[in-house]
Curated annotation (Swiss-Prot):
It holds the Pfam family ATP-synt_C. GO terms for biological process: proton motive force-driven ATP synthesis. Keywords: ATP-binding, CF(0), Hydrogen ion transport, Ion transport, Lipid-binding, Membrane, Mitochondrion, Nucleotide-binding, Transmembrane, Transmembrane helix, Transport. The lineage of its organism: Eukaryota, Rhodophyta, Florideophyceae, Rhodymeniophycidae, Gigartinales. The keyword Transmembrane helix applies. HAMAP family: ATP_synth_c_bact. This is ATP synthase subunit 9, mitochondrial. PROSITE patterns: ATPASE_C. The gene is ATP9. GO terms for molecular function: ATP binding; lipid binding; proton transmembrane transporter activity. It comes from Chondrus crispus. InterPro entries: ATP_synth_F0_csu (IPR000454), ATP_synth_F0_csu_DDCD_BS (IPR020537), ATP_synth_F0_csu_sf (IPR038662), ATPase_proteolipid_c-like_dom (IPR002379), F/V-ATP_Csub_sf (IPR035921). This protein is one of the chains of the nonenzymatic membrane component (F0) of mitochondrial ATPase. F-type ATPases have 2 components, CF(1) - the catalytic core - and CF(0) - the membrane proton channel. CF(1) has five subunits: alpha(3), beta(3), gamma(1), delta(1), epsilon(1). CF(0) has three main subunits: a, b and c. The keyword Mitochondrion applies.
């Protein structure tokens, strides 16, 4: 494989993982909001936890897509 092509793949895979930084911030915001909501209204604990898990799953889906794209760029 050409060295230029291999280095372009490495750079592309690295750039594809930039989306993971936003996911880390998003997960922090989701759970930070959960803590604030618990402090305001502890009686809604079960309902808020369900919404939090849903938000966490949707946020992590973005990370999985970015990681999948990085692997596709790197290994194809």
């Amino acid at each position: 494989m050409n060295v230029t092509l291999q280095s372009a793949k490495m750079i592309g895979a690295g750039l594809a993982t930039i989306g993971l930084t936003g996911v880390g911030a998003g997960v922090g915001i989701v759970f930070g909001s959960l803590v604030m909501a618990y402090a305001r209204n502890p009686s809604l604990k079960q309902q808020l936890f369900g919404y939090t898990i849903l938000g966490f799953a949707l946020t992590e889906a973005v990370a999985l897509f970015a990681l999948m794209m990085a692997f596709l760029i790197l290994f194809t």
